[in-house]
From Swiss-Prot:
The gene is ints4. Residues 426-473, 767-796, 993-1057 are annotated as: Disordered. Residues 428-462, 767-792, 1046-1057 have a biased composition (Low complexity). It comes from the Eukaryota. HEAT repeats lie at residues 236-273, 275-310, 487-524, 525-561, 563-597. This is Integrator complex subunit 4 homolog. Component of the Integrator complex. The core complex associates with protein phosphatase 2A subunits, to form the Integrator-PP2A (INTAC) complex. Residues 1014-1030 have a biased composition (Basic and acidic residues). InterPro entries: ARM-like, ARM-type_fold. Gene3D superfamilies: Leucine-rich Repeat Variant.
Length: 1233
């Protein structure tokens, strides 16, 4: 019992222990399940968060799409509302809105665009091959920022290569190693050792070839593959590489053998010692069974040569040329490239070809000519290109490439088949020999004839065979059975003809290029080329035709074009391609015409081209200009071109006739070298030349004749401009002629124009004291002589007093306008004739516009628009010209003060004008309030700004010691601006003397007036009245400063009584000052330069630029700038006009500093790209197919002096138009797919 109980107890204890163990295991399993569930929950939460984020992004995108659709609907509604009143009925086609960019959500969800670097490394060890490939692709596109990331990446890749079982993943990992080995943070030697280890232990062919490719990539980046100098460490590495890859040369895989051969050719450490061994090794692999290995061996030989080794011609050449008959085109292509290297490096090396010795370059040329007949297009194209690059080829081989003739050699004589190279003398000799034999046979006795008949019959048969020419026509030679004659290889014969007749246009174009290159080096070959190049003008492909035209142009100076060939060239001027016609125009300028009939045919063809395509006018004019300058035959066809008949008087043609202008371009340019043509021209042609050289200065010569007998410039009648009332006496007036032939005479013409503008006596206003004294003395001496007075009056009428005298006389407004027009015409003419004086004449022309605005405002009324016009012109004069002297700057500052005063007064009148209660009329003479009206006060800001400008003017004149004008002195006195350093005692004494002189002059003038009144009563002439009025005007001019002082003193007296403020007094004085203001005389003392910007026109294309308006539009801008100092002030401006509102929309784009490339001092070339944001611009058109003109120009920005916030923009170039066409996503959808 005890035993049983004890056993039971033991069993119970064991059961309890087992239950406890089971409970513990169950508890552990529950814990593990809980942990696993927690991990799953966390993963689910993360996935849910990612899904929520994606959903939020999709919702945001949908909201943006809805907003865009709403905006588009609103814009469409606005457009429909605007189009309803116009009642435009157009078919409406509602297309689906595809303005949203296409986004593949599945790709974005699978590929984590914003994954961290650690997650990508973890994905490399994933079991999913798709995830591995995605990670490898993204890692290859990333850049390594630091060294630690590079070490981690290399470690992970190496670790995965040991474990990876898939070969395609191994290939991707090895390629990734090769890509990152080029990074500076990566140790490339370590990666190289790892790849060599893989080569030793790997058996996969794909993995081995990938290792060899990446080893070659790494070796190219190292220094030991770039030359002969090798360090000890790199030499050991090279030896190690060779040891590892040498067994792979016997691999069964052709891919492995190919990559091994390529690698051996690129890592040879000592080219002088080991190159021969490598060449022998590669020579053995030229006979490999796989074409890829043969191709690789040929490439390796060329690589060894490019690295500086010398190739053994005797060992390699005969084996290489056997591969020209290889069945694979890649091998044949590399073969002709390699033998081309042999031919150019060792041209005079003698080789044996067909049992004869020949120069290596000639034999290579023959082999390449054979390749022109190859079945592969790639080989034929390469062969045609290499023919032109083969140098020092014998002339007989070059000539044979242009004909289908078979060339044979025997006993030093040359024969041809297919052409009559055998002369007629040789044929006559044969005929004479035959006749002699027949005569000898007839003279023999008849008894002997039968005995000789058996022997004679074969001879007669032989003579018939050799004597008759039925088998070989006249001029040919029978080479059948001639053992002493060797026929050349057929590949050379007609090689270029075969290339020109190829069915692929790439081969034809390459043949044309090679013919052109060989013709440049050989004149005889060039002369034979012309027929074939001209025949290609009829090719069906436009690019081939243009290439042949340009090739003929390059050799046109060395050859002579025949008349038949010229007619073929001229016939192509009817082509519809603009580029082809322009190429033909350039060709006609480079060829030599043989006779005058060719010149006449060329001229007529160009005129026909002008009538059919008027847009070619500039190209045709340039062609006729160069033809006229280079051909001496124009003298013989002048009568036909101008339709001149010596029997009849010539009729003056219309100068606007474009065909007459084209003929005159040819004729007048021929006069430069052939002066005899001038005597054949009618008289009106010289007058037409003056008009043509101003209208077309680029195509007409500026000088025709240096003799003084022929006057080429018109006479300028200055008195007729000033005194238009005396038209009857114009014949008696003095005239001055100006013959503009060189820069000195152009300067003289400019001075005459300035004297016409400013007067014969430029200081007529400032120096009236001396003039008045002389006039008084003359009047006192000649009071009793009326005839002398009449003569003096006539002389005074012939004088030119300039614009200031006419400006003072209000009755001579028409004469003043004519004076300005004449001066403007002269300035424009000087700008078109002389480039050195163009900036100066342009400056005077701008100043003339300032004078016209001041005169027009003084005659009518002064508003804020006149001030804006003056400010705009002043900005151009101050900022668009370089090198202006200080006197001109001071005058421009004076005009700036005048324009600022007009701006102040105009703003006051506008602010004080109240709305009329009844109908009132405003006076047309002035918008300013009169002095008797209610007092107006100036603001303190306006007074401060005006005083600031006056102080700047005063300081500038003192710094450079310049004289202050009388009009500005009155303003300085008004505002009490003085300088104690300059206003010394001498100036005070001079002022007193001037006052005394003025008083004396006033007394003398009164006496003169009395005497003149008596003479008027006696003679009763109207001319003396006009003279007295002019004298009174001169006196008023001298007394104007004193008048201003008197008015100020009178106003001071009135203001004391009426108790007005000083600002009202200043207002009245400024009104008086503007009414009496006379613009000063401006003269430039030195040569100046003008800023110029030329935007290069884009390539002409009929199709507009299509773009999506939701994305920015990229445009490439090229320009040339000159005389620009501050490059930071230059910007690119783009403008387009709205069709519906008419407003101009503009954008300003910054030009980066890297876009400027200097060409000469202060001159640059600009090349940059701009991005235009043109959203919703497609609504700015009436139809979906209508393009929008976009204007691009280069401008300069300046801060306004009055207000720093305002910016003034000055255009420096003419705008260039880009036609753009906004399209919907529907049109671009196939391109995106």
């Amino acid at each position: 019992m005890n035993k049983k109980s004890h056993q039971q107890q033991v069993l119970q204890q064991q059961q309890q222990q087992q239950q406890q163990q089971f409970q513990q295991q169950h508890f552990q399993q529950q814990q593990q399940q809980q942990q696993f569930q927690q991990q799953q929950q966390q993963q689910q939460q993360l996935q849910q968060q990612q899904l929520q984020q994606q959903q939020q992004q999709q919702i945001q995108q949908q909201q943006q799409i809805q907003q865009q659709q709403q905006q588009q609907q609103q814009q469409q509604q606005q457009i429909q509302q605007q189009q309803q009143p116009q009642q435009i009925q157009q078919p409406q086609q509602q297309l689906p809105n595809f303005s949203v960019p296409i986004i593949n959500q599945s790709i974005i969800s699978n590929i984590k665009l914003y994954s961290t670097f650690e997650t990508l490394l973890l994905s490399l060890s994933s079991t999913d091959t798709r995830e591995q490939t995605k990670a490898i692709i993204y890692l290859s596109s990333l850049t390594i920022n630091n060294k630690s990331n590079g070490i981690d990446l290399v470690y992970c890749i190496q670790k995965q290569l040991v474990v990876e079982a898939h070969n395609h993943i191994k290939v991707l990992l090895i390629n990734l190693l090769g890509d990152i080995s080029l990074d500076p943070f990566i140790d490339s030697f370590h990666i190289l050792n790892k790849l060599l280890y893989l080569i030793r232990n790997e058996k996969s062919k794909k993995v081995l070839s990938s290792c060899l490719i990446n080893i070659n990539k790494i070796s190219k980046s190292l220094t030991f593959s770039k030359g002969n100098d090798v360090n000890s460490s790199s030499s050991s590495l090279i030896n190690q590489i060779i040891e590892y890859i040498e067994p792979l040369l016997h691999s069964t895989s052709p891919l492995v053998r190919r990559e091994t051969i390529v690698l051996l050719g690129s890592i040879v450490k000592n080219l002088d010692k080991e190159s021969e061994e490598i060449q022998i090794l590669l020579l053995n692999y030229l006979k490999d069974t796989d074409f890829r290995v043969r191709e690789a061996s040929l490439k390796s030989l060329s690589v060894i040569f490019q690295r500086g080794a010398s190739l053994s011609v005797n060992k390699l050449y005969q084996s290489i040329i056997l591969l020209l008959l290889d069945s694979f085109e890649q091998v044949r292509l590399e073969c002709i490239k390699l033998i081309w290297i042999f031919g150019n490096i060792y041209p005079n090396h003698i080789v044996v070809s067909g049992g004869t010795k020949i120069r290596l370059v000639d034999d290579v040329f023959k082999k390449i000519c054979n390749a022109v007949n190859d079945s592969s297009v790639i080989v034929r194209n390469c062969a045609c290109k290499l023919l032109g690059c083969t140098y020092d080829v014998s002339l007989n081989y070059l000539i044979q490439t242009l004909s289908k003739e078979v060339m044979v050699w025997g006993k030093g004589k040359q024969y041809q088949i297919g052409h009559s190279s055998i002369t007629k003398q040789r044929l006559q000799q044969k005929q004479q020999q035959q006749q002699q034999q027949q005569q000898q046979q007839q003279q023999q006795p008849p008894q002997q004839q039968p005995s000789q008949q058996p022997n004679q019959q074969p001879n007669q048969q032989q003579t018939n065979v050799s004597g008759t020419h039925i088998a070989t026509p006249e001029g040919d030679f029978d080479v059948v059975g001639s053992d002493s004659l060797n026929i050349l290889e057929s590949g050379v014969i007609g090689a270029f003809i075969q290339g020109l007749e190829d069915e692929f246009y790439e081969v034809r174009s390459s043949a044309i290029d090679s013919m052109c290159e060989l013709s440049v080096r050989n004149d005889e070959f060039a002369q034979k080329n012309i027929d074939f190049l001209v025949d290609i003008f009829n090719d069906e492909i436009e690019s081939v035709r243009i290439n042949s035209i340009n090739s003929l142009r390059k050799i046109g100076n060395n050859v002579v074009i025949k008349e038949e060939q010229l007619h073929i060239i001229l016939a192509n001027l009817e082509s519809s391609s603009k580029e082809e016609r322009q190429s033909l125009h350039r060709l006609l300028t480079s060829i030599h015409l043989s006779n005058y009939s060719c010149l006449h045919a060329t001229t007529q063809a160009l005129l026909m081209n002008l009538s059919r395509y008027p847009y070619d006018i500039h190209s045709i004019f340039e062609t006729l200009k160069i033809i006229g300058q280079t051909n001496p035959f124009t003298e013989f066809i002048v009568d036909d071109l101008l339709r001149i008949d010596p029997k009849f008087a010539s009729v003056e043609p219309n100068m606007d006739d474009i065909f007459y202008v084209a003929v005159m371009v040819l004729v007048l340019n021929s006069c430069i070298k052939n002066r005899n043509i001038l005597s054949l021209l009618p008289s009106f042609s010289f007058q037409h030349h003056l008009y043509f050289k101003d209208k077309y200065p680029k195509y007409f010569p500026q000088n025709l004749q240096k003799d003084s007998n022929i006057i080429l410039a018109p006479t300028l009648k200055y008195s007729s401009v000033v005194n238009n009332n005396n038209n009857k006496n114009n014949n008696n007036n003095t005239t001055t002629t100006s013959i503009i032939n060189d820069n000195g005479e152009i300067n003289q013409f400019l001075n005459l124009t300035l004297s016409l503008l400013y007067g014969d006596n430029n200081n007529i206003i400032n120096n009236n004291n001396t003039n008045n004294n002389n006039n008084n003395n003359n009047n006192n001496n000649n009071n009793n002589n009326n005839n002398n007075n009449n003569n003096n009056d006539e002389n005074d009428e012939n004088l030119n007093y300039g614009f200031q005298r006419l400006f003072l006389n209000q009755k001579k407004e028409i004469q003043l306008n004519k004076l300005f027009q004449e001066c403007k015409r002269n300035f424009k003419r000087i700008s078109s004739i002389c480039l050195s004086l163009k900036p100066t004449s342009d400056f005077y022309n701008k100043y003339l516009k300032i004078l016209t605005t001041i005169v027009s405002s003084s005659r009518r009324f002064k508003t804020i628009t006149t001030s804006n016009q003056l400010n705009h012109l002043l900005y151009k004069l101050n900022h668009k010209f370089i090198g202006v002297d200080n006197n001109c700057k001071l005058i421009l500052m004076e005009i700036g003060i005048y324009s600022f005063i007009i701006e102040i007064l105009s703003t006051i009148t506008l602010s004080t004008s109240s709305p009329p209660t009844t109908t009132t009329t405003t006076s047309s003479t002035s918008l300013f309030t009169s002095i008797n009206s209610t007092p107006i006060e100036l603001s303190n800001d306006q007074i401060n700004q005006l005083t600031k400008k006056l102080n700047e003017y005063f300081k500038f004149s003192n710094d450079f010691k310049l004289e202050i004008s009388t009009s500005i002195k009155s303003l300085l006195d008004l505002f009490n601006i003085k300088n104690n350093n300059i206003n010394n005692n001498n100036n005070i004494i001079n002022k007193k003397d001037k006052k005394l002189k003025e008083n004396e002059e006033n007394e003398e003038n009164e006496e003169n007036e009395n005497n003149e009144n008596e003479n008027e009563k006696e003679n009763g002439k109207n001319k003396e009245k006009e003279k007295n009025e002019n004298d009174n005007e001169n006196e008023n001019e001298n007394e104007r400063p004193s008048k201003i002082q008197k008015t100020t003193s009178e106003l001071i007296k009135t203001t004391t009584t009426t108790s007005t403020s000083t600002s009202t007094l200043i207002h009245y004085n400024l009104i008086e000052w503007t009414d009496n203001y006379i613009p000063p005389i401006l003269k430039i003392s030195n040569l100046i330069k003008k800023k110029s910007v030329d935007v290069i026109l884009p390539i002409p294309n009929d199709k507009p630029i299509e773009f999506l308006d939701i994305f920015p539009l990229k445009l490439m801008i090229n320009a040339k700038i000159e005389n620009i100092r501050n490059l930071d002030s230059l910007f690119i401006q783009s403008t387009w006009q709205s069709i519906h509102t008419g407003q101009l929309n503009s954008q300003i784009h910054i030009i980066p500093k890297s876009a400027f490339t200097p060409t000469k001092p202060l001159s640059y070339n600009i090349s940059c790209s701009i991005y235009l944001s043109l959203q919703n611009i497609r609504h700015n058109r009436l139809s979906s197919k209508e393009s929008i003109p976009l204007r691009i120009s280069i401008v300069e920005q300046f801060l306004n002096n009055n207000n720093n916030n305002n910016v003034t923009i000055i255009p420096l170039s003419k705008f260039v138009i880009f036609n753009i066409l906004p399209v919907d996503n529907v049109n671009l959808l196939p391109n995106l797919i």
